[in-house]
Amino acid sequence: MTQKNKHIFVFGIFAVDLSFYVDKKVKPGETIIAKSSNIGPGGKASNQAISARKLGASTTLITRLGNDNFNSYANDIWRREKLFASTKIDKNLPTGMAGIFIDDKTGENSVIVDPGASAHLSIDDFYSQKSKMKKGDIFLTQFEQSSDTTFSVLKEARELGMITIFNPAPFGIIRKKAYQFCEIITPNETEAEQITNIPLKGKRDVERAINKIRDLGVEK
């Protein structure tokens, strides 16, 4: 299979980001006026799938949405980006949302996330696209769904002969055997420390952490 024929499958959440720019932290019981605000698409999986599509890759997003107005908002975005999204609609839960409070001066932020319907992503969502997956295709997931689901989809994708990429964010505890199903892992410094329990204070620590991650079964 040539590089051009590889298809990227991204498994994970979509959330609507509701961002508020403020000049101070909100105290309990206090109401303040934001300096500005905006609404935008979020969720690591959706953002990664959109980025891959913009770069010209044939891409499928596997996610869940609620039966609400944000459902239409998500589909409008994916349609505009020419991204195919395999979505299951949950009639009893909302589409994922994130409230982001950003300090207008420092840029520091606080985030509250409700994954909504996406919290119930399962292996069944993976199976809905399994017939389209081929050996050599790329499978990318994160840690925004449950650890059991993350383990199961990585295992299934690897057994199909797919190139599996795991972005372990936000960090969570997962069975160590899951790392054997990751061809590539992309932790940042904090996540690498959490996976290995090695404080990264210098080059030698980084090398030790890399070796420990490889010992878990990760190839790259």
What are these language model-derived features?
Residues 50, 75-76, 131, 151, ...:
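Alpha-helical segments flanking ligand/cofactor-binding loops in enzyme cores
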Residues 1-64, 69-75:
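Glycine-rich phosphate/adenosyl-contacting loop at the front of the ribokinase-like
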Residues 77-92:
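A glycine-rich helix N-cap at a beta->alpha junction
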Residues 13, 63-67, 90, 104, ...:
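Cofactor-binding loop segments of dinucleotide-utilizing enzymes, especially the Rossmann-like FAD-
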Residues 53, 79, 158-159, 214:
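Anion (oxyanion) recognition and catalysis
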Residues 88-90, 100-138, 143:
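Conserved phosphate-binding/catalytic loop of the ribokinase/pfkB sugar-kinase fold
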Residues 159-220:
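Conserved phosphate/ATP/ADP-binding segment of small-molecule kinases
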